[in-house]
């Protein structure tokens, strides 16, 4: 068949992104407009502000992606857009624009689950690198600021299927990073800040135990025969433990001084963050990261074994974390379990992943109706 060129659009949180891919295997362009510095002063993403920024950015971002791909709009075969999950207002901007573009160009529209996109971007890069087909079933850990999920993914004749075999009961892992960074006066986004600082601390200085969570659904109709193979997460407890450590070790004055010092710097560098952190803070950060990483790795490997997974994918914004990657590679390697990550630029939100996830649907003719809507709490199944 002729080449299939898909334009992807992503606007689920604080990145406005567009990308063009060919045949689900070649990235022709990928443009991301980040709002990090817009939200940094507030210590986190402000939903209404995010929506406004998407409105400003979406037209030029899409135009740039098409130009960078060396394509014209009439050469686009389909338009894919994130329909959820995410921030309702932010999603609406992307969905509305994609629908308008689909109508104006008379091109089919494909609605994509954001979480499925994170899974497919790993497969996309494997194809780009000429790596052979991965083995199924696949266990995918999707871990980011808003999500911590384990999915058993299989590729069947009727398409891809996903079974939720574990998720967070409260905070996502990336959310815990953001909250701890804010608590320590380091600001937003917490993930890359803490990852950089953790290298300078002692990860054995503070002990953070995790409770083992057993899945129990009170509704018998929702119970699955494989419930005993589930692995769930919880990260609100470690955030509270960090707060207690701060209070009992009289760190609040130093934190306020750090917060004040960083406010004077418009775009702090990693060296700036390191300069305002004392040994006690660095040890606390390193211990926090070691605890979260060990919890994610141990539970993902346990779920892989319980569900007879042949391959492990680790994806999402937190997958860019250096210690997480190193620990997964070492421990999965010891078990002989292949583990794959997206490249760091494609770990965070982007539109190449949306176009990649749309490609199988394009081949099977699964197109969205003209009344496609955004769904903030969309589930992957």
From Swiss-Prot:
Gene3D superfamilies: 3.30.420.40. Signal peptide: none annotated. One of its GO terms (molecular function) is iron ion binding. Its cofactor is Fe(2+). Its main location: cytoplasm. It catalyses: L-threonylcarbamoyladenylate + adenosine(37) in tRNA = N(6)-L-threonylcarbamoyladenosine(37) in tRNA + AMP + H(+). Coiled coil: none annotated. NCBIfam families: gcp_kae1, T6A_TsaD_YgjD. This is tRNA N6-adenosine threonylcarbamoyltransferase. It comes from Koribacter versatilis (strain Ellin345). The gene is tsaD.
């Amino acid at each position: 068949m002729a080449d299939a060129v898909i334009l992807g659009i992503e606007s689920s949180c604080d990145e406005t992104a567009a990308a063009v891919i060919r045949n689900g295997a070649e990235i022709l362009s990928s443009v991301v407009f980040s709002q990090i510095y817009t939200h940094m002063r507030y210590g986190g993403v402000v939903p209404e502000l995010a929506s406004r920024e998407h409105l400003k950015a979406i037209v030029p971002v899409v135009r740039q992606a098409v130009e960078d791909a060396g394509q014209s709009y009439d050469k686009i075969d389909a338009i894919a857009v994130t329909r959820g999950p995410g921030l309702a207002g932010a999603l609406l901007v992307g969905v509305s624009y994609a629908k308008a573009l689909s109508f104006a160009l008379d091109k089919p529209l494909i609605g994509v689950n954001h979480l499925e996109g994170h899974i497919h971007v790993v497969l996309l890069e494997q194809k780009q690198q000429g790596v052979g087909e991965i083995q199924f079933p696949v266990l995918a850990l999707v871990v980011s600021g808003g999500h911590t999920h384990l999915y058993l993914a299989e590729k069947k004749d009727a398409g891809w299927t996903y079974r939720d075999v574990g998720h967070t009961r409260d905070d996502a892992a990336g959310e815990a990073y953001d909250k701890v960074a804010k608590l320590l006066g380091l600001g937003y986004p917490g993930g890359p800040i803490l990852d950089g600082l953790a290298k300078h601390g002692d990860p054995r200085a503070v002990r953070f135990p995790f409770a083992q969570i057993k899945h129990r659904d009170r509704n018998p109709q929702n119970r699955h025969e494989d419930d005993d193979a589930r692995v769930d997460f919880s990260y609100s407890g470690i955030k509270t433990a960090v707060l207690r450590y701060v209070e009992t070790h009289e760190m609040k004055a130093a934190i306020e001084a750090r917060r004040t010092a960083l406010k004077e710097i418009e775009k702090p560098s990693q060296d700036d963050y390191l300069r305002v952190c004392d040994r006690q803070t660095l040890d606390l950060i390193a211990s926090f990261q070691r605890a979260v990483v060990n919890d994610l790795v141990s539970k993902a490997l346990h779920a892989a074994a319980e569900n007879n997974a042949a391959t492990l994918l680790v994806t999402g914004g937190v997958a860019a974390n250096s210690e997480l990657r190193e620990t997964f590679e070492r421990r999965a390697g010891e078990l002989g379990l292949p583990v794959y990550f997206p490249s760091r630029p494609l770990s965070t939100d982007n539109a190449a992943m949306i176009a990649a996830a749309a490609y199988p649907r394009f081949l099977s003719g699964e197109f969205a109706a003209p009344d496609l809507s955004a769904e903030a709490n969309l589930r992957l199944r």
